[in-house]
Design a protein with these regions (language model features):
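Ser/Thr-rich, low-complexity intrinsically disordered terminal regions
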Residues: 59-65, 109-146, 164, 169-172, ...
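A short, structured loop/turn motif at beta-sheet edges
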Residues: 98-101, 131-134, 160-169, 191-201, ...
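Sec-exported extracytoplasmic/periplasmic mature domains
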Residues: 106-116, 265, 269, 273
Length: 328
């Protein structure tokens, strides 16, 4: 029906109602129509799906993956997913810590503790923290896996954000606009929520973006010097039935995410020991955890790794001391 015809029809009907009924009845009829209209509008608004909270999404992820966590190929409750799309590489690691949610929150909500975590990575030569008005900065000093003085490293500045902290949910993000070697939009995220048995379900994700030029360089690297460096995702089987693992940027980001996951676990495992003993214990613990996955994570002999980290830790403490004294 044409719109003009609709309006004329409505006018005729209203006039008909008005003529046949008293004004009071007409007003009742009018109020009825308004009420129905409001009910429909409210119903339509409520039918629009609200954005899901991070806590709900993480809890749903836990329930959907309970069986996978119990039968994980890692040999412990740990699963990994990754993707590579356009200029972005992303990985998610999910696992279970045998520690209470409150103990996880108390450790990770302190920005300085993240330097103890990330500096376990072989490529992180030092990490410092600094508080600014309304912001925390974590500076990663990135270099080769062997020992390097700090002046030979690349600095990447991360912003620490405690996005959400509730009684039953924690969400922390470390973000850097510019990364090493032309990468950008680096985001490390940590989520946690309590589950049964006094344990904590955790999520560690990492992502970054790169450029076309960097993609070409990466392909050359992984086809030559980086040949044989693989991640954890199985893409098929070889002629004798052995698994073929993902390589390239996805393989690299999977390795790094698992290293950071085990770094968090190592720090958590040693909180019960005196502060002065923790550094040497957590470097040894981290090495032992990662050495279970030699194909993906082996880089250095344990003796060399511990020696390099001991030197790097001294450099880190000296640098952090100068920042605390206002010299940096």
């Amino acid at each position: 029906m044409h719109i003009g015809c609709k309006y004329r029809f409505i006018a005729v009907m209203v006039n008909h109602v008005f003529q046949r009924h008293k004004i009071r009845n007409f007003l009742k009829f009018f109020l009825f129509i308004v009420t129905v209209a409001l009910l429909f509008s409210v119903g339509s608004a409520s039918s629009v799906e609200k954005p899901r909270r991070g806590e709900d999404i993480l809890l749903d992820t836990y329930h959907r993956n309970m069986a996978k966590l119990e039968t994980s190929s890692f040999g412990l409750p740990l699963i990994l997913e990754s993707f590579e799309r356009d200029d972005k590489v992303h990985v998610d690691v999910y696992g279970i810590f045998d520690y209470s949610f409150s103990s996880v929150v108390n450790m990770l909500k302190i920005p300085a503790n993240w330097c103890d975590i990330v500096s376990l990575h072989p490529n992180i030569k030092a990490c410092t923290y600094k508080e600014l008005p309304g912001d925390w900065l974590l500076t990663f000093y990135i270099g080769r896996k062997v020992y390097q003085p700090l002046e030979d490293t690349r600095q990447v500045i991360y912003h620490y954000r405690n996005v959400d902290q509730q009684r039953g949910y924690l969400d922390i993000i470390l973000s850097a606009g510019e990364g090493p070697f032309g990468t950008k939009d680096h985001n490390m995220r940590f989520e946690a929520l309590p589950i049964d048995g006094g344990r904590t379900f955790v999520h560690v994700s990492y992502s970054y973006s790169d450029s076309v030029a960097l993609r070409f360089t990466e392909k050359v690297y992984f086809a030559t010097l980086g040949w044989g460096k693989v991640g954890f995702t199985v893409t098929g089987k070889d002629s004798v039935g052995n698994p073929i693992y993902i390589g390239g940027p996805r393989g690299a980001i999977e390795r790094n995410a698992v290293r950071y996951y085990f770094a968090i676990q190592s720090v958590m495992d040693l909180l019960r020991y005196p502060q002065e003993n923790r550094f040497s214990m957590r470097t040894s613990k981290w090495y032992d955890l990662t050495s279970r996955y030699r194909k993906q994570l082996f880089e250095l002999d344990k003796k060399d790794y511990l020696a390099f980290k001991a030197k790097e830790h001294k450099n880190q403490m000296t640098l952090q001391g100068s920042i605390g004294a206002g010299l940096q």
